[in-house]
Amino acid sequence: MQKQRTILDFQRMKAEGEKIAVLTSYDFPMTGIMDACGIDMILVGDSVGVVVAGYDNTLPVTMEDMIYHTRAVMRARPKAFVVADLPFLSYQTDLKSARLNAGLLVKDGGAAAVKIEGGVNVEETITAITDMDIPVVGHIGLTPQSLHRMGGFKVQGKGEEQAEKLMADALAVERAGAFAVVLEGIPMSLAARITAELSIPTIGIGAGPHCDGQVLVIHDILGLCSKYSPKFVKRYAELAPLIGEACSNYIAEVKGGIFPEERHGFK
C-alpha cells in the first residue's frame, strides 16, 4: 500500500530522477479510483469551473467552490498529496486575504498545500503563506487566471525576452519558498532550462517531457470533454460515447417497460 505522500517525497523524487504523476480531481469517487492506482499528487484545480460547472474559463470560481470540492476529495482519505488552487481574487488584492484564504483551504477544505498563479508579482504572497507553514505550489507560463492580459490561451515564453522573464518568475517562486512549480504552455527547451536551474520540482502541463513531473485534467484524459482538447492532452480513454450508450439504453428500457424487472424490486 502506498504511504502518505509529503513534500519530502517530491524533493527526493526530483533528486533521484523519478517522475511525479499528478492529476486533477474534484470529487470523492474519482479520487478513490486514482489514489488506488498510486497517483503521487492530486490537484483540486479551479479548472473545476470549466470541466464541471461549464464556465468558459476559471475566473468565476469562488473560494466556496474550492472548499466544497476539496472537502469532497479529502473524504476519500487519499494517500496522494492534495493541493488546492487559490481561485481568482482570493490572493491578488492583499496579503491578509491571501493568508486567510490559503488557511481556509487547509483548515476547512483539508488540503495539504495551495497553488498560486504568478511569478515575481506574487513572490511576497508566496512568502506570506509559507510563513504560516502552508506549503505552496507556484504556477508560471500560461496562467489561466491571466487569460485576458495574455490575449487568450497562448503559449508563453517563445521569444528571448519572454523566456528570460519566465526564468525570473521561476527563480522568484523558488526564492519565495514554494516547494514545486507548475510550468504551463511553454516551449520544451525553456521548461528543460528551468527544470535544470531550480532545486524544486517542476510539474509540466503542455511544457514537454523534461519537467520533473506532469499534470493533466482528469476529464481530458478520460475523453469526457469533447468541445475542446488542447494539443498537449493525451486521451487514455474515450468515456463519453460509453456514457452516452448507457444513458440511451436506460432510456430505451424505461420507455419500453423493460426496466425495472422483478429482481430490481422489494417483497
UniProtKB/Swiss-Prot annotation:
Reactions accelerated catalytically: 3-methyl-2-oxobutanoate + (6R)-5,10-methylene-5,6,7,8-tetrahydrofolate + H2O = 2-dehydropantoate + (6S)-5,6,7,8-tetrahydrofolate
Keywords: Cytoplasm, Magnesium, Metal-binding, Pantothenate biosynthesis, Transferase
Binding site for 3-methyl-2-oxobutanoate: D46, S47, D85, K115
EC numbers on record: 2.1.2.11
Disulfide bond positions: none
Swiss-Prot/TrEMBL cofactor(s): Mg(2+)
Localization of this protein: Cytoplasm
Major place of residence: cytoplasm
One protein family per Pfam: Pantoate_transf
Note describing how the cofactor binds: Binds 1 Mg(2+) ion per subunit.
Keyword Kinase annotated: no
Cellular component per GO, a single term: cytoplasm
GO biological-process terms attached to the record: pantothenate biosynthetic process
Any one GO MF annotation of this record: 3-methyl-2-oxobutanoate hydroxymethyltransferase activity
Enzyme class per UniProt: transferase
Pathway as given in its UniProt record: Cofactor biosynthesis; (R)-pantothenate biosynthesis; (R)-pantoate from 3-methyl-2-oxobutanoate: step 1/2
Active site: E184 (proton acceptor)
The keyword Metal-binding belongs to this UniProt entry's keyword annotation: yes
Membership in a protein family: Belongs to the PanB family.
UniProt subunit comment: Homodecamer; pentamer of dimers.
Entry protein name: 3-methyl-2-oxobutanoate hydroxymethyltransferase
Organism annotation: Citrifermentans bemidjiense (strain ATCC BAA-1014 / DSM 16622 / JCM 12645 / Bem) (Geobacter bemidjiensis)
Name of the encoding gene: panB
